[in-house]
């Protein structure tokens, strides 16, 4: 469950995100999995409250999972890598507060107007790059409990819109509001140092792939409806 859904129902969010993660570790313990790779989030950096970045229930749950993983390793020798993806974009990334750049690309492909409700520097982590990082991680042999940031490319929302409009000059996509309340420029190097040099996508490559995918689905009559709510 992502940020808005955890905010709407914190108890359910905790059951899904925290208890659900514990269940994964318990199953690993029972059947003897060699390692676990799980998704944390950059939202965990909002803890403890009162710091530079926004605190959320979702971030609390993700930080709890990171500490849970450390204890499973210390007490039961279950190795794990927790990956904190920053702002993932690409086909089907259509829910959560950080999905708005994907929705903007979809809106352009479907000839719809859309205003991204934030601006400024932003992490652009293409879904293909995020998937590669997880695949490389689960293929790596290791014995400890690690947590790594996964940032992708740091670029402004405004420049992302410019790339989109180079593909479709008549696109009715804008941005407004404040800067996004999470760090846009974390380092991927510690993760790459452990697991190897997984594929990287530039912002331009990711936007082009995403836009063309939405266009293809539109032509096939299979493009999902635009989610302008959550």
Regions found by a protein language model. Give the residues of each.
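Active-site segment of SDR-like NAD(P)-dependent oxidoreductases
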Residues: 1-4, 42-49, 86-89
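NAD(P)H-binding glycine-rich loop region in Rossmannoid oxidoreductase-like domains
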Residues: 1-16
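Conserved Rossmann-fold NAD(P)-dependent oxidoreductase catalytic core, especially the SDR/UDP-sugar
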Residues: 15, 19-59
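Conserved active-site region of classical short-chain dehydrogenase/reductase
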Residues: 18-26, 67, 131, 135
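Active-site beta-alpha turn of Rossmann-fold NAD(P)-dependent dehydrogenases/reductases
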Residues: 37-41, 84-86, 151
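C-terminal substrate-binding subdomain of Rossmann-fold SDR/epimerase-dehydratase oxidoreductases
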Residues: 117-120, 124-230
């Amino acid at each position: 469950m992502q940020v808005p859904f955890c905010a709407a129902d914190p108890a359910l969010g905790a059951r899904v995100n925290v208890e659900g993660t514990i269940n994964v570790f318990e199953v690993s313990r029972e059947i003897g999995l060699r390692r676990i790779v799980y998704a944390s989030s950059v939202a965990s950096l909002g803890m403890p409250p009162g710091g530079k970045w926004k605190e959320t229930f979702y971030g609390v749950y993700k930080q709890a999972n990171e500490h849970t993983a450390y204890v499973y390793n210390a007490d039961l020798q279950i190795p794990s890598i927790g990956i904190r993806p920053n702002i993932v974009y690409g086909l089907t990334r259509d829910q959560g507060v950080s999905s708005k750049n994907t929705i903007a690309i979809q809106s352009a492909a479907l000839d719809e107007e859309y205003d991204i409700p934030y601006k400024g520097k932003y992490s652009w982590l293409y879904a293909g790059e995020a998937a590669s990082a997880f695949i490389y991680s689960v293929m790596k042999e290791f014995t400890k409990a690690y947590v790594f940031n996964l940032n992708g490319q740091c670029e402004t929302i405004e420049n992302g819109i410019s790339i989109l409009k180079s593909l479709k000059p008549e696109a009715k996509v804008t941005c407004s509001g404040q800067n996004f309340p999470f760090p846009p420029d974390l380092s991927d190097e510690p993760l790459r140092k452990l697991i190897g040099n997984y594929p990287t996508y530039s912002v331009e490559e990711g936007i082009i792939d995403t836009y063309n995918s939405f266009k293809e689905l539109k032509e096939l009559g299979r493009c999902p409806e635009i989610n302008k709510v959550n």
